[in-house]
Amino acid sequence: DLCKRLQAFDVHYLMTMDGTAMDCKTKAGLKEQQIRTYKLFGEMGSYCRDTYGIEVLMHPERRSLIETREELERLIDLDLCICFDNGHYAAANGNWKQGDRSALDFLEAHIDHIPYLHFKNVSGEIRKMEMEGALAPDDPRMDDIMCDLEDGIIDYEAYRDLLDRLNFRGVGIIEQDCPHATTQEAFEKAKKNLAYLQKIHLIQ
């Protein structure tokens, strides 16, 4: 039993996601599957919490069954918590301009259901091309939509200030989305992003 194993390591969260990459047309034809997905997450959340004291977290992914603000709020209505990946959220709900506040606004509205954060950022250049229809979902350039934390549309100093104001005391992880990087390149990116968050005093 997975939850028993998690308990043995004093783990309090179980991360889940639907993990289905698709285009809007495909998604529109999957309403029944989406309903079943909500039901599954709701049942899983109640069971793990009531039986083991483990909180099920839903990690939203862009181009999946649950990615928009409305879709995530339906999860929250089921009393589920979210692993809030600000990059995936902004890439699905925000625009391409520097200082886009979509992720900050959602975080502020639903902080009581967000104990866990993934730090990411979105390339404004790639996002703009996507929104203007210049990139197909399978265009290789879409693999570069996530960028280094200091280079994207999310203002991390504003994000830091919001977390301070909300007195966030949960977990935060720098997550790398660089599918074509070598191990060494990914490691260098991780060090760069860590140094940036330390420089702006988001972390120590």
Roles of regions detected by a PLM:
Residues 1-84, 91:
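Active-site acidic/histidine proton-transfer and metal-coordination neighborhood
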